[in-house]
Amino acid sequence: MLIVQKYGGTSMGSIERIHNVAQRVLESVKLGHQVVVVVSAMSGETDRLLEFGKNFSHNPNKREMDRIVSAGEWISSAALSMALERYGHRAISLSGKEAGILTSSHFQNAVIQSIDTQRITELLEKNYIVVIAGFQGADIQGETTTLGRGGSDLSAVALAGALKAHLCEIYTDVDGVYTTDPRIEEKAQKIAQISYDEMLELASMGAKVLLNRSVELAKKLSVKLVTRNSFNHSEGTLIVAEKDFKGERMETPIVSGIALDKNQARVSMEGVEDRPGIAAEIFGALAEYRINVDMIVQTIGRDGKTDLDFTIVKTQIEETKQALKPFLAQMDSIDYDENIAKVSIVGVGMKSHSGVASIAFKALAKDNINIMMISTSEIKISVLIDIKYAELAVRTLHAVYQLDQ
């Protein structure tokens, strides 16, 4: 049985921990499994390399930065490979390019287009443990690209799909997926199994266990995911289609989890010319810069003008400013607020229950937490609030929906 295992930066965070990962991998091998391992850079290494690159340019070339940053995963994959060989098993490290991962040419945020698995398959047949540098690949010209923050999860899922692996195990420093972040709410409960759709909402709304792009890809490729703690042997959380749940689930809970995302910024455009097509032009320009826009509120003003508010990822503020430059003459003012957070309530049970939003709004009002913006989908409700109330809001909502029981 072929298994893909991914180990994050915390799991690979020291020499001792890399040795521990090697032992964990060998446990699977001793059970008769073929194992492909995907690794992140050691904890803190990506940030260190980013800061290193910024010493040479105020506006670093993205191609060159990808070459610098990708070195972190090269080092950790080679280190783990050597540790595995020390313990008596054949192992080899491969860069994303060497592993056959073909991507688009969008440096720092590339998209995986295909994977040629021939070399990996040949190595597995020769009884190698294949250790692959996550977070990276190469475009059609052979240029090194990176997949964006958290891209090692994406590497692992894509490889699991391409190799038709039985399972993709994501190892982190937590026991699995929780009803909310246990570091915020100590009464958070581990979820034994969760659907792709619920996990996708939690991931896209700020849950830290998995990158939302990796959940989307797992659903598309029908890759069975398990998130586990690399520091113990707990069962973890199984993430599959609802039809593949193990055993019988009791009636679906109304709310499955509460997610918090502090990496948000609010863009407020006041006095925008109110004419047909202006919104399409603005959001089209943002799309050209590959800026992810989330919550959107438009307020109809007077005298042929309107106000437009929306949220973006905080790290994309500079790109947003560049994209909106051509529109500055068509508005009165623009403001960027980084002191906000998005709190989301997620659950497939919300489809068949009314009053879920009302419960949340009343609970937040009782704690004097003002809601700036609201967005909803079939299985989630998100609110934008002042960042200083973020953790209080999470604890309040976790309690009001009885997720601590």
Curated annotation (Swiss-Prot):
Q: Which GO terms describe its biological process?
A: diaminopimelate biosynthetic process; homoserine biosynthetic process; lysine biosynthetic process via diaminopimelate; threonine biosynthetic process
Task: Give the CDD domains listed for this entry.
Answer: AAK_AKii-LysC-BS, ACT_AK-LysC-DapG-like_2, ACT_AKii-LysC-BS-like_1
Q: Name the catalysed reactions.
A: L-aspartate + ATP = 4-phospho-L-aspartate + ADP
Please list the residue ranges annotated as the ACT domain: 267-344, 345-405
Membrane-spanning parts:
none
Cellular component terms per the entry's GO annotation: cytosol
Q: Does the keyword Repeat apply?
A: yes
Q: Which InterPro entries match?
A: AceGlu_kinase-like_sf, ACT-like_dom_sf, ACT_Aspartokinase, ACT_dom, AKii-LysC-BS, Asp/Glu/Uridylate_kinase, Asp_kin_monofn, Asp_kinase
Name the Enzyme Commission number(s) assigned to this protein: 2.7.2.4
Q: In which pathway does it act?
A: Amino-acid biosynthesis; L-lysine biosynthesis via DAP pathway; (S)-tetrahydrodipicolinate from L-aspartate: step 1/4; Amino-acid biosynthesis; L-methionine biosynthesis via de novo pathway; L-homoserine from L-aspartate: step 1/3; Amino-acid biosynthesis; L-threonine biosynthesis; L-threonine from L-aspartate: step 1/5
According to the UniProt entry, its GO molecular function terms are:
aspartate kinase activity; ATP binding
Alphabetized, the UniProt keywords read: Amino-acid biosynthesis, ATP-binding, Diaminopimelate biosynthesis, Kinase, Lysine biosynthesis, Nucleotide-binding, Repeat, Transferase
NCBIfam families recorded for this chain?
A: asp_kin_monofn (TIGR00656), asp_kinases (TIGR00657), PRK06635.1-2 (NF005154), PRK06635.1-4 (NF005155)
Q: Which family does it belong to?
A: Belongs to the aspartokinase family.
This chain's protein is named Aspartokinase
Q: Which organism is it from?
A: Helicobacter pylori (strain J99 / ATCC 700824)
